[in-house]
């Protein structure tokens, strides 16, 4: 995954955004080892070591692909927002895969606020970082949960923020399917109720594909 991440970062041509990514998650950055190892969540999706990297990379790759299809999207801004949208989780969760818990800062401030301030501090260390670009990037971080009910203080108001939010939400939901499928007992087609999905998940199509392979063997 690290190689894929480095390749994606290399495609960000805007110099200030590229410098910011290198400062925060570059190979020599202090934040790289925790970003590489952290879980993406406590329960719902990618709640395991390297889960945050896996999730952010997947969101970044999808954002990159969609940016090439829809006109008007600032690809560099969208990719940077995708890779950094969850960086507050480095401070919000303990980095122990066997016992993922919210930290005091995670409980008192929340991962969105922690991510906002972490990125803003680094932006302030880059001379000449365009203020308008900083506003749009920070807006992606603040709005990526999509609604006030889900914890975002503001709603997505730009193309890039809307794109990151929607792909982030999609990635989380599909990650829930992966988790639920692993929890199925032999012969089960439905998972139990899942809060993230608002119901159960159905997996019969996967079992039907696997059965002929077993018969052929």
State where each predicted segment sits.
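Short hinge/gating elements
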Residues: 2-9, 39-48, 99-101
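Residue-level signal for secondary-structure boundary elements
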Residues: 13-17, 29-33, 127, 149, ...
């Amino acid at each position: 995954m690290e190689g894929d991440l480095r390749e994606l970062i290399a495609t960000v041509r805007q110099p200030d955004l590229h410098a910011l990514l290198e400062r925060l998650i570059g190979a020599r950055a202090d934040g790289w080892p925790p970003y590489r190892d952290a879980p993406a969540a406590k329960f719902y999706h990618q709640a395991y070591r390297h889960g945050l990297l896996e999730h952010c990379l997947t969101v970044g790759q999808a954002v990159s692909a969609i940016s090439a299809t829809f006109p008007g999207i600032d690809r560099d801004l969208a990719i940077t927002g995708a890779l950094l949208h969850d960086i507050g989780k480095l401070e919000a969760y303990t980095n122990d895969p066997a016992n993922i818990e919210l930290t005091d800062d995670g409980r008192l401030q929340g991962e969105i606020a922690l991510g906002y301030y972490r990125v803003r501090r680094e932006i302030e260390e880059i001379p000449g970082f365009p203020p308008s670009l900083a506003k749009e990037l920070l807006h992606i971080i603040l709005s990526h949960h999509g609604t006030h009910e889900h914890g975002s203080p503001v709603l997505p108001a730009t193309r890039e923020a809307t794109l990151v939010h929607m792909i982030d939400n999609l990635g989380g939901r599909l990650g829930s399917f992966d988790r639920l499928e692993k929890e199925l007992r032999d012969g089960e087609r439905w998972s139990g109720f899942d809060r993230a999905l608002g119901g159960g998940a159905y997996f019969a199509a996967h079992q039907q594909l696997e059965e002929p392979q077993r018969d052929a063997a």
